Amino acid sequence: MRLWPRLALYAMAILLLAGCSNNSNRDYAKLPKGSYNDTSYTVKKGDTLYFIAWISDSEVSDLARINKLKPPYRLEVGQKLRLDSSSSTGRLTSTKRKSSSTTLAKSTPPPGASRCWRWPTSGQVISKYSTADGGNKGIDIAGKRGQPVYASAKGKVVYVGNQLRGYGNLIMIKHGEDFITAYAHNDTMLVNNGQDVKAGQKIATMGNTGTDTLMLHFQIRYRATALDPLRYLPAQGTPPKC
């Protein structure tokens, strides 16, 4: 299989935009999403933008935008964050709905995008894809240390390493000539550069390298353009129909 030039792949990897944070480890499966209902939030010890977005049922990219935060979204105890897009009430509900429709429009599947994608791991999606400037160009899935990370589709491993700051142990797999998937923040990496992998093959274990959050950052890219993984993945726990 003809591969893109290594330099181009490395440049593409640098452009991956993940929501890196200083999260303390939290079991999001036990945290009630949307349990906090106010227009502002005062940061407490151990809080992170991921956690605040989760309990306020907001998007990390929206909170970062209205509070003018840049990755890796470092927070200070006592810092007051706005949860609404104006000085009045309303939180991010209308903003999120508008953003969601914009995301759907901008991430229309390109030709050939419908292929047999599988979930790379199981767990709560704690940050979704966003088309906003500086937004998450994939999804972040919370889980437990050491849980399996799987190849989303068959392909060839084109990058295994940790040279890209903020992504920790990163694996990239090329699928055909146009698609690449990325798997970041792994604990152990179980594949080598140039290795062929099958769909559903275990390629790594979940960790928090490059971040303080136990999670997998996952991307699907078409000719270097980020797609919304949730538009292509089946429901969690459901095998792909292919």
Regions found by a protein language model. Name each.
Residues 43, 69, 143, 152, ...:
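Surface-exposed strand-loop junctions at beta-sheet edges and helix termini
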Residues 68, 160, 176-200:
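Short histidine-centered loop motifs in beta-beta connectors
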Residues 76-80, 85-168, 227-230:
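Surface-exposed, glycine-biased beta-strand/turn segments
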